[in-house]
Amino acid sequence: MTDIRIEGAKIIIVGGNSGMGLALARRLLGEGAAVTIAGRSEDKLAAARRDLGDHPGLATIAVDISREEEVATLFRNSGPLDHIVSTAADIEGAYQLLPTIELMAAQRVVESKLYGPLLLAKYGAAHLPPSGSITYTSGVAAYRPAARGSVVAAVNAALEGLVRALAVELAPIRINAVSPGWVDTPIWSFVAGDAKQATLDSMAQRLPAGRVGRPEDIADAIRFLIGNEFTTGTILHVEGGHRLV
């Protein structure tokens, strides 16, 4: 495998202020990359800076990737980049049975996990070199859907279709996605509420891997996709064997 150099690379991580994105930012900064974390919440961006120790290679910027002009401005001001990553997902209120789901909650999932990634490619690709990459996160719900998860399952599947199409259209820039399984991140507070830990523990007992994922597991997978110059149009499953049970 030829591993693309990360030291000195300029990388934008959308959604890097918590969970998987924050773990990735920590890893890339440790390898000498210049990392910009983009997110909607100034408070969460400030918390990420504190968590990462105000690293000299770190910058943060407030942006809503569902708003086209904000995405255009992000890249207008970014200059040349090497890689773009998005772990952003707004699923608050989306895990509901059909009789109770609100369309606005479904719309937020579409905006954060489909429209947003589309806009990142539309405006970001021109700033990437031929060796550059864009990496998204989809999710196991596209393969193992469950009650209350219809919206997330559908949007994850749509994002994976977008990945394959963009890999052809934007070649030789590489476009990939990591499909995580159940990962212990703050997003579970929206999904399970007070039952978060019990829910994750129950899934850990089912999985062949014997545990749920950690943010670092997904960061490792994204790092692989960034670095492997012969991988494109690929969905990398990192889910502890969830699709098997």
Regions found by a protein language model. Give the residues of each.
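Conserved glycine-rich cofactor-binding loop
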Residues: 17-18
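Catalytic Tyr-x(3-8)-Lys segment
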Residues: 196-217
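Conserved Rossmann-fold SDR core element
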Residues: 160, 169-185, 231-238
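Rossmann-fold cofactor-recognition segment
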Residues: 52-69
